[in-house]
């Protein structure tokens, strides 16, 4: 019985330490409370996003812009350490649904240079619908401001015209 309790306590301790480290890592990537403008906003997360970030932050790109990732499950956003790969030095995370206008305001979408909306792979056949809703939400947030460029990933070509009408 003592052995079982000891193993349980060790597991609890390890889980607590891991949770603290993950939370600290996520906090270091929160959007700073400064006026950010001209940045890139990436809505939704997928492994394809890593290559996209590497491309926009590559050494051949002279116009370096910070990247703000908006995703409802930040634990899924797995980024290389800032010290290991320079492309990820200026990458921040906003937790929340990218179709939610409050969350988009927190990501400072109205001041963004461009917004890239990736298809949410978890939505399967409804991914394009969610992408269209995200496009509309971005337009609504930016109604008084200059509209950022909106680029949206379309999985089914039959929804392409709907995405264009939504602002992509």
Spans of features found by a protein language model:
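Cytosolic regulatory regions of ion transport systems
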Residues: 1-168
């Amino acid at each position: 019985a003592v052995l079982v309790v000891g193993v349980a306590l060790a597991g609890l301790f390890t889980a607590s330490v891991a949770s603290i480290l993950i939370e600290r890592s996520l906090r270091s990537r929160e959007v700073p409370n400064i006026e950010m403008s001209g940045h890139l906003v990436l809505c939704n997360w997928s492994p394809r996003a890593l290559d996209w970030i590497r491309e926009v932050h590559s050494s051949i790109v002279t116009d370096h812009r910070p990247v703000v990732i908006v995703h409802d499950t930040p634990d899924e956003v797995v980024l290389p350490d800032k010290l290991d790969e320079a492309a990820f030095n200026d990458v921040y995370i906003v937790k929340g649904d990218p179709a939610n206008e409050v969350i988009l305001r927190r990501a400072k979408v109205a001041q963004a240079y461009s917004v890239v909306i990736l298809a949410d792979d978890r939505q399967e056949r409804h991914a394009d619908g969610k992408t269209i809703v995200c496009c509309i939400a971005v337009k609504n947030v930016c109604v008084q401001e200059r509209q950022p460029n909106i680029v949206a990933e379309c999985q089914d070509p039959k929804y392409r015209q709907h995405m264009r009408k939504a602002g992509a």
